[in-house]
Structure formats: structure tokens, C-alpha cells
Curated annotation (Swiss-Prot):
Keywords for this protein: ATP-binding, GTP-binding, Nucleotide-binding
Record protein name field: Nucleotide-binding protein Pnec_1620
Organism annotation: Polynucleobacter necessarius subsp. necessarius (strain STIR1)
A GO molecular-function annotation: ATP binding
Role played: Displays ATPase and GTPase activities.
Binding site for ATP: G8, I9, S10, G11, S12, G13, K14, S15
Keyword Nucleotide-binding tagged: yes
UniProt binding sites for GTP: D57, A58, R59, R60
HAMAP family given in the database record: RapZ_like
Family: Belongs to the RapZ-like family.
Amino acid sequence: MQINLITGISGSGKSVALRAFEDAGYDCVDNLPVSLLVNLIITLEKEQCERVAVAIDARRGQSIADLPSTLENLRKSHQVRIVFLNADTNTLIQRFSETRRRHPLSTNAKQPQSATLIEAIDKERNLLEPLRAQAHSIDTSNIPAHALRSWIQDLLKDKPIGLTVVFESFGFKKGVPSEANLVFDVRCLPNPHYDKVLRPLTGNDKPVKEFLEKIPEVVNMEADITQFIHRWLPHYIADGRSYLTVAIGCTGGQHRSVYLVNRLSEYFRKQKDFGILQLNFLDRHRELDSIPVAKS
């Protein structure tokens, strides 16, 4: 059975992620107590369920500490994937303010709401840190709900085994993705933004590709990043990791980083050098994916 555990910081988008799993045909359970997880899996096995997504949060406090060992036992006979939703504290405070909902771990109403909320968020981060360390982490601070749904849909296309390498473009204007394991700063490369014709386009467009692929610095940067990843990827695999996020950043996350992420993703998808190792590759464009989808 494929077991997908959805967890993370309250307000980071767990409900959106769970709905994406449900839309993909998974049996879904929300807010399941940790103590009931094993019994749930046994019941679903009897019903011949093949795929399940379970959302668990930290509202039951210290019981979450038992979850890593529970998951380790489940991995002996099932495929287990953990999806961890995260966001920076300021974004979470804003979201709770907009929805006027209380944080599940907010218990002291005598203090100002902002102080109580910050304490609750910090407590939740500490409780969930052991899970985040072994999960596929998604920072939702700068992405809307539709982008998160799209990213989850892409994730579901991959097998929940082996190492998943995520190539993600971003703009430094909005900060470095918190889930990034490797960060490459490509702001030193010539910027298509200063070409009036190329400015409204993106790294996905042919004119921008043709512009960048002719620049020696871009070619050398791509070669150096490729060589670095190619050399060290086997070591990350040997380290037992399930996920590796390679973030490429330029100023706005529109041209240079998008182009290089596409090039890297295309290159590594074609590689056979890693033998029988099972590798999955995903590519994301944080700033482009955040653009609202036009309604038809």
C-alpha cells in the first residue's frame, strides 16, 4: 500500500494538499490521531485499499513523538511518503489573521493574540522537526493555493521510492525557499530583463532561451552546476535521503533561474550514469507558478 502522510505547520496548506490527493483518487483521512494510524492501515488493507493520504498535525502534543517509529515499522511492508507543508512565521500570522481562526496549540488567551500565536507556531515547529527532517518539504510562504495543488499533482506522478530531486527556480526578492538543500545564486549572469523585447517573457520562452544559451557565462555556470550535482548526487543517495531540493535563484525568478532549472532537469532526466538507482526528478518555478491562472 502507498501511505502518504501529510503534515506540517498549521496554516501552511495541509487542507489544500489533502484535497489534491483526494482529487487524484486517494482515500483520505484528516486529523487522524497518531495512535489510530496503524489500525487505520490494517483496516484499509482488509478493504484492499492501494493508496491512502492521511493528514496529521501536532494538536495532540507529545503523541506526535511516537510517529517516526510508527512510520519506520510501516515502511517494512508499505511504501511511505511524508509531505511536510511549511511557511515562514510572518506569513502564518497573516493567514491566521485573515481567517480569524485560532492556532490548534494556542491555549493562553490572556496574552496578546500575536504573541500567543508566535509561541504556538514555535512549539509546533519543535514538535514536528523530526518529521520535517525525513519529509518532502514544501514552503508555501510565497505560493497560492492553486500552485500548491499543481506541485502536489506533479509529486504524485513520481514513485514514492528512491531519491526525488527537485529543481526549483526562485527570485531572491521573495527570499530563498526554506526547503532548499543546495542553493545556487545566478544573479551574476546577464539579465534578459534589460532587453525590452525579452522583459515580459520567461525562461520558458524560445527567445529567452536563444539569448541565454549564446552567453559564455551562462554556459559555464550551467556546466559547473551540472558537474557539482553529478559528482555529489551519489553521496546524497548514500546518505539515505529521500528528497534533495536544488534551488536556482536570480533576481525575480523569471528568466535566468527558470532557464537553468529547465536545462538541469532535462539533462538529469536523460542520465543513465546512476545505474540501477531509482531517481525521480521534478522541476518547479516558484514565482511563475504563483501567477494566478486566467479564468476562461
